[in-house]
Amino acid sequence: MHLGDLKHPNELHGLSPAQLEDVARQIRERHLQVVSTSGGHLGPGLGVVELTLALYQTLDLDQDRVIWDVGHQAYPHKLITGRFNDFDSLRQQHGVAGYLKRTESDFDHFGAGHASTSISAALGMAMARDNHGESFKCVAVIGDGALTGGMALEAINHAGHLPNTRLLVVLNDNDMSISPPVGALSNVLNRARLSPPMQFLSGSVEESVRHLPFMGGEIPAELNRLKGSMRRLAVPKVGAVFEELGFTYMGPIDGHDIGEMVRTFQAAHREGGPVLVHVVTKKGKGYPYAEADQVGYHAQSAFDLGTGKAIPSSKPKPPSYSKVFGQTLVKLCEQNSRVIGITAAMATGTGLDLLQKAVPDQYVDVGIAEQHAVTLAAGMACEGLRPVVAIYSTFLQRAYDQLIHDVGIQKLPVTFVLDRAGIVGADGPTHQGQYDISYMRAIPNFTVMAPKDEAELQRMLVTCLQHDGPTALRIPRGSGEGVPLMEEGWETLPIGRGELLREGDDLMIVAYGSMVAPALATATLLEEAGLSTTVINARFLRPLDQALIHPLARRIPRVVTMEEGALPGGFGAAVLESLTDQDINVSMLRIGIPDKLVDHATPQQSKEALGLTPAQMAERILERFSNTSGDLPASASIKALQA
């Protein structure tokens, strides 16, 4: 069978072991071929090929529900549910998404991108099923890293209290999330992983008893009670944990042995309540480079299949904002033992891997636990430490109550570095950092800022650590502007003071963070069109530099704000509210991300689709103000000027 000809995943039912091995080979080949060409998540999907095939052998995918936690390990699922031939478009604009989307396939029952949501969703579906009197199966597949998230543990706590609700949780245990998982639960899983494979009465022994002539296919109550007693004696410590929480535990089993998994899943489906099957897999299975470096090959840009090495870009790039942040924090930690870097399982992505290597005693990884990370930092600050919490903008959303309740209200000196703020590209709407401006500006006592370049990032980090109160600093994904950097001796910035970059009389642009450089480029185009333009680097969202902005707004009749974030409640709204409160009436245009989701594409494609390139913004400015003011200079279009 060629997977390109597969019409429905149920067609895989009844394939021989040899045929299933061939299907597994095709999945890995296609997975590697596409990701090596266009980039994407590599290790997670390679590790669950056999798990996916075995699980789907035991399900009717016309009706049963499978919820994949996070979704980056679901490439094999996509390849056998109708997307094999279109997989070349993975993570590309208008192509196959890198995560699961309910709008993409009827087999994608629940969308995701953040960790630890699958058990809650699957339990909700199971409860709805029972409410409707239906009988389909509900399965959550979750990794050992995601299992450490509080939401997953909350769902397990609830499901274990519902002994008659059929739910299967498949624990994909590869001893990894993006980085190696941390914590006591991870240690327990590791000990179970090293124990001999367990054979339970609910598996092969039960099958033998069921087929005895005098049993008639039924398992008497006495044997069921014996089975429960034997299981409690036999399961490893991790199994005892889940058993005490109300789950039937099976495992650990080999996650690359299709036959063993099929038998175990079949036994699990026969149970009448919540079941957890513990499956041990190898991240990156089948590709030696990914098996050897499971962190580095979690996700990859384009790479050479033969050597495993990344294909270099056509020209050198400046260091990323994340790297500059990490390098600067290392220096600051070396100078001050009270400074502590905290990550929630994203050390490499945020640049804190540099701190982990250089000053490990001042580095903390809490696992996938953003809420805990924030309040842990609050506790540290109470006792005189200066914690720096580095979290992606999209993931900090998960700890909003802690930002307000535990840090903001108490005015604690915790610094938050919001990485991947703004448009992030191919990961799509679950990962865009478009909301942090709106959600951070609403929290009292916070000082919130964003640098125009990587040198200003260094000064802002020092400013945060010397400020007696909570601070937040947003940085974009990708390379900096290529400006010179200082090794040390960074000066602080005055809190709430912006920067006047150029002066003009016709128009004022107030730009925030990553939009400062595009604002300057836009101003150049407007000058060529005859529009004299002032440009301000706002630097601070809270407090806004009213002393700089207000006098200029009284003199300049047109104001444009630029931000790489959501317009509702955003930076432009802050400027507009500030002007309105002082009865400063101007013609205004707010440029940013409109009230919509930003789908997967390259960052440049997304910016073009949103009208955020300098040429597009200049055109829009001319169009906006030529409709409201007759005194603008006549000019050709920006496109014509660029030609």
UniProtKB/Swiss-Prot annotation:
Pfam families per record: DXP_synthase_N, Transket_pyr, Transketolase_C
Gene3D superfamilies the record matches: 3.40.50.920, 3.40.50.970
Primary gene name: dxs
Keyword field: Isoprene biosynthesis, Magnesium, Metal-binding, Thiamine biosynthesis, Thiamine pyrophosphate, Transferase
PANTHER family xref list: 1-D-DEOXYXYLULOSE 5-PHOSPHATE SYNTHASE-RELATED, 1-DEOXY-D-XYLULOSE-5-PHOSPHATE SYNTHASE, CHLOROPLASTIC
Function (record text): Catalyzes the acyloin condensation reaction between C atoms 2 and 3 of pyruvate and glyceraldehyde 3-phosphate to yield 1-deoxy-D-xylulose-5-phosphate (DXP).
Cofactors that this protein relies on: Mg(2+); thiamine diphosphate
Its EC number(s): 2.2.1.7
Positions that bind Mg(2+): D144, N174
Cofactor note: Binds 1 Mg(2+) ion per subunit.
The protein's name: 1-deoxy-D-xylulose-5-phosphate synthase
Subunit: Homodimer.
GO biological process: 1-deoxy-D-xylulose 5-phosphate biosynthetic process; isopentenyl diphosphate biosynthetic process, methylerythritol 4-phosphate pathway; terpenoid biosynthetic process; thiamine biosynthetic process
Reaction(s) catalysed by this chain's protein: D-glyceraldehyde 3-phosphate + pyruvate + H(+) = 1-deoxy-D-xylulose 5-phosphate + CO2
